[in-house]
């Protein structure tokens, strides 16, 4: 029983840290975009995230954990292997004005939300459905 429990705990621990679909898994061989302790290889820290960006045919309006254990963003509108982990300053900002329900909003709103104010991450929420709490 103890041996089975020990094997399960080892398996569970490995599973938590195993990243099956790395962010840069579709890159050409010989091109290094692996992160180092200082951040992604050969990328200055001051480069800004580009929103929205397309990764694997999906449009992202904010930092994502798609294919990663930690939030990241692309440095290009179409992901081509240039990326960085998101710091607090990197997350997408509200876009004003934005359209919601055919109406223009200049500030965060509680309309459509039960408790908290929110804003759109694109000029047209009705089209993109991208939002965050304010």
Swiss-Prot record:
PANTHER family: SEMINAL PLASMA PROTEIN, SEMINAL PLASMA PROTEIN HSP-1. It holds the Pfam family fn2. Glycans are attached at residue 36. It comes from the Eukaryota. It comes from Bos taurus (Bovine). O-linked glycan consists of Gal-GalNAc disaccharide which is modified with a sialic acid residue (macro- and/or microheterogeneity account for differences between BSP-A1 and BSP-A2). Could enhance the fertilizing capacity of bull spermatozoa upon interaction with heparin-like glycosaminoglycans present in the female genital tract. Exhibits both simulatory and inhibitory actions on the release of pituitary gonadotropins. SUPFAM superfamilies: Kringle-like. This is Seminal plasma protein PDC-109. It is found in: Secreted. InterPro entries: FN_type2_dom (IPR000562), FN_type2_sf (IPR036943), Kringle-like (IPR013806), Seminal_plasma_PDC-109-like (IPR016356), SP_Capacitation_Regulator (IPR051666). Major component of seminal plasma. Its main location: secreted. The keyword Oxidoreductase does not apply. The lineage of its organism: Eukaryota, Metazoa, Chordata, Craniata, Vertebrata. Residues 1-25 form the signal peptide. Homodimer.
């Amino acid at each position: 029983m103890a041996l089975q429990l020990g094997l399960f705990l080892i398996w569970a621990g490995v599973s938590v840290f195993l990243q099956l679909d790395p962010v840069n898994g579709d890159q050409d061989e010989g091109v290094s975009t692996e992160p180092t302790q200082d951040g992604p290889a050969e990328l200055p820290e001051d480069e800004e995230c580009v929103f929205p960006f397309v990764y694997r045919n999906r449009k992202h309006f904010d930092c994502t954990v798609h294919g990663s254990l930690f939030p990241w963003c692309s440095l290009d509108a179409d992901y081509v292997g240039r990326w960085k982990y998101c710091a607090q300053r990197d997350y997408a900002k509200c876009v004003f004005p934005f359209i919601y329900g055919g109406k223009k909003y200049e500030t965060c709103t509680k309309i459509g939300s039960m408790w908290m104010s929110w804003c759109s991450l694109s000029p047209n929420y009705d089209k993109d459905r991208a939002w965050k709490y304010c």
